[in-house]
Amino acid sequence: MTANPLFRWLRPTDIEKVSVLQLIARDAVEGATGGIHRSRHVGASVDFKEHRPYVHGDEIRSIDWKLFGKTDRLYIRQYEDETSVRAMLVVDQSGSMNYSGTRSRELTKHDYAIRLASCLAYLLVSQQDSVGLVTFDTAIRKHIPPRSRPNHLRLVLETLAGAECRGETELGTVLHQLLSLCRKRGIVMVLSDCFGNVSELFKSLSMLRANNQEVLLFQIIDDDEVDFPFQNRTLFRSLELTEQQLLVDPVSLRESYLRKFAMHQESIQGGCKQNRIDWIPVRTSEAFSSVLATYIARRGQA
């Protein structure tokens, strides 16, 4: 029997920890009612949408007293300014994401991205937000438009569970293609190791920002890529170009590698700051729920 995808990457312990979190859109959104985010439409231009039962903590002025007189029950008038956000998860499935180091609990970067994306999808749907999915390598491989229904969550999780790493990546090109899929204001959440052309990456990310998209960049990396711990003569194989391999003394390369890696990270951090993008560097040795809890707490203080 095929394992339930809901619990392959989204475990009950993750659900328990994620359920207490709340991801609020920073930018005003526009869309269907019923969510928790601030709308772009305010004041007299706001249209009445529907009633919902009054709960403790609601503003008294929002109570529909005429309806109370007819039903003897308290109801709140909901307007178009109580909106849900459209979020798009963009998950890298290129060959480099298939790396797993000695400290990653046997998880590849792709495994980690799938589980983190699953947690994000569950969190968004539980907030009555709409979540969509794009998986990619050199091009978009799967595209699921944003929806908020519980059965839609299953489709997203099944697609994530079926994704396989392969080949090279063109993150900048893929994000440029994404522009045509994100016509309405929302949040784009990118999960990738971001190994590639940084200038092309931010050229596309800046266009997404100009297209009214809030962008979250989860850069998923392995501890080995951060500190290059290799000591003995090692055969390094490319995970994207399978014919490329190199037998070297890693100690002689370590200083040069760490310098170039630091420059790469500084470029990503600087590009995110310049474009007002949330950069969340994540190591595969970190717990998923802790990563989300820490980020959301920091986001709430910004």
List each language-model region with its residue ranges.
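Helical mechanochemical/support elements of P-loop NTPase systems and associated helical scaffolds
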Residues: 61, 83, 152, 167, ...
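Conserved phosphate-coordination/catalytic loops
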Residues: 111, 165-172, 195, 259-262
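An amphipathic, basic-hydrophobic helix/alpha-beta surface used to engage anionic
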Residues: 1-148, 187-191, 197, 203, ...
